[in-house]
């Protein structure tokens, strides 16, 4: 295969969600970079049902060569079938779908690690449904880390045009955040961010901004002491240890202005909303979630299952398209590096 042509594996996501709809729409869309060869790991019946629901005429091509993908066909929806025994009702989540969801993710990783595929893109899943079925992970990121051969703690990065952010803490209550922010976590995130910006984003000298936790970054201890006791010492140590440009702690209310965004390549934020609000405000439909620190490239659309609009043929595929295109570009950068 031409070195510029890249196979990108796409997981099924939750079958009751918008995942199948946005997958079909994305693969049919001209915004997908021409050299990308997307392959979906899902149920044939599920995709056929969704095709009918959204009036799609795209042909399905079953992939049997899971190493070199020699039977890939252009202008088709190429699929590696997996079993889904339950009847699907779009918009109605069910714990019975959990094994199918999990199997699609596991197969994505397994095939990626044993083939010429360049990256995986995961479609949205519902954490509550997965928890109820005995899924013992906080989400995709932790589960993918358990399947990775690397033993690094993975780092979540959100990407949109003109901004990249990393939340130090993710799906935890606000009241727990201060005790979860540690010097070692900050240093680890800085290191993974630096390595990834160089190897996957082709940024030779990364500039990293670190936000404060408290209003006005603590105002020298007058509004909380996390900056003085934890964040500043961690930044100072990381500057010496990793030899990279670091700025912070910067108050989050100024970190994302149009002028300030020109001063850094990624902002490391203290918690989920601090990192995601600016991404979604800037470009709600084109945000991408990237997992750093794995031994494979993984991206996903930066939105959820949207059960409320599933089956209505109104789901927007742009975030999935952006995730597929970014996975491709990262694989090219990694190859060139």
Each language-model region and where it sits:
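Contiguous, glycine/small-aliphatic-enriched amphipathic segments in soluble metabolic enzymes
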Residues: 1-140, 184-270, 274-280, 286-288, ...
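Short acidic/polar capping segments at secondary-structure boundaries
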Residues: 125-128, 135, 162-163, 171-174
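Short, flexible loop segments at boundaries between secondary-structure elements
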Residues: 147-163, 292-308
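Active-site glycine-rich loop that binds ribose-phosphate moieties when present
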Residues: 142-146, 150-152, 172-198
């Amino acid at each position: 295969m031409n070195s510029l042509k890249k196979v990108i594996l796409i997981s099924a996501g939750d079958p009751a969600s918008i995942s199948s709809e946005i997958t079909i729409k994305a693969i049919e869309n001209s915004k997908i970079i021409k050299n990308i060869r997307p392959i979906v790991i899902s149920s044939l019946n599920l995709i056929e049902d969704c095709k009918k629901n959204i009036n799609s005429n795209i042909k399905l091509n079953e992939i049997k060569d899971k190493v070199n993908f020699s039977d890939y066909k252009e202008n088709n929806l190429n699929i590696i079938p997996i079993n889904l025994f339950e009847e699907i009702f779009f918009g109605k989540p069910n714990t019975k779908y959990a094994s199918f969801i999990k199997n699609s993710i596991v197969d994505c990783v397994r095939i990626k690690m044993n083939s010429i595929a360049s990256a995986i893109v995961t479609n949205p899943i519902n954490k509550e449904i997965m928890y109820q079925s005995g899924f013992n992970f906080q989400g995709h990121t932790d589960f993918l880390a358990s399947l990775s051969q690397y033993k690094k703690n993975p780092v979540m990065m959100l990407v949109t045009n003109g901004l990249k952010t990393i939340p130090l803490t993710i799906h935890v209550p606000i009241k727990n955040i201060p005790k979860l922010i540690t010097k070692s976590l900050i240093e680890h995130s800085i290191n993974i961010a630096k390595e990834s910006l160089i190897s996957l984003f082709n940024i030779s000298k990364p500039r990293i901004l670190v936000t404060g936790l408290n209003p006005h970054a603590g105002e020298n201890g007058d509004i909380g002491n996390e900056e003085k006791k934890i964040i500043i010492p961690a930044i100072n140590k990381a500057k010496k240890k990793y030899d990279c440009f670091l700025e912070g702690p910067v108050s989050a209310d100024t970190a994302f202005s149009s002028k300030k965004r020109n001063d850094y390549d990624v902002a490391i934020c203290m918690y989920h909303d601090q990192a995601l609000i600016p991404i979604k405000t800037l470009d709600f439909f084109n945000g991408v979630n990237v997992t750093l620190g794995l031994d494979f490239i993984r991206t996903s659309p930066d939105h959820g299952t949207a059960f409320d609009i599933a089956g209505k043929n109104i789901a927007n595929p742009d975030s999935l398209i952006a995730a597929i295109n970014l996975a491709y570009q990262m694989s090219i950068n990694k190859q060139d590096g």
